[in-house]
Amino acid sequence: MTTVHSIADPCDPEVSPTNNRHLTVSYASRYPDYTRIPALTMKGQWLEAAGFATGTEVDVRVMNGCIVLTAQQPQPEESELMQSLRQVSKLSARKQKQVQAFIDVMAGSK
């Protein structure tokens, strides 16, 4: 017989049944041989309410029998100066020195 201490306490589910959605795996065909590829389609206002507005980037984690979709937080806008710095860092060492010399002249340090 089970003791009182080994009976599981009832708990609320993390997701309410009203938030559950049911999908059916359909297919998309691929040209030129029209091979059937498994496909899922999700649409509805509930996506935006759940944090998946149009244009939101999504991380997808796949496990056996489980797919987890996570909305990525929007990245803050990078300043024009940081964008320029990123471009300069891709240049050759010689061109980077030329850019540094130009900056020094403009700043009046040399």
Swiss-Prot record:
One of its GO terms (biological process) is RNA metabolic process. GO terms for molecular function: DNA binding; RNA binding; RNA endonuclease activity. PROSITE patterns: SPOVT_ABRB. It is an enzyme of class 3 (hydrolase). Its main location: cytoplasm. Its EC number is 3.1.-.-. InterPro entries: SpoVT-AbrB_dom (IPR007159), Toxin_SymE-like (IPR014944), TypeI_TA_SymE (IPR020883). It is found in: Cytoplasm. Residues 29-74 form the SpoVT-AbrB domain. Keywords: Cytoplasm, DNA-binding, Endonuclease, Hydrolase, Nuclease, RNA-binding. GO terms for cellular component: cytoplasm. Belongs to the SymE family. Involved in the degradation and recycling of damaged RNA. It is itself a target for degradation by the ATP-dependent protease Lon. NCBIfam families: PRK13605.1. This is Endoribonuclease SymE. The lineage of its organism: Bacteria, Pseudomonadati, Pseudomonadota, Gammaproteobacteria, Enterobacterales. The gene is symE.
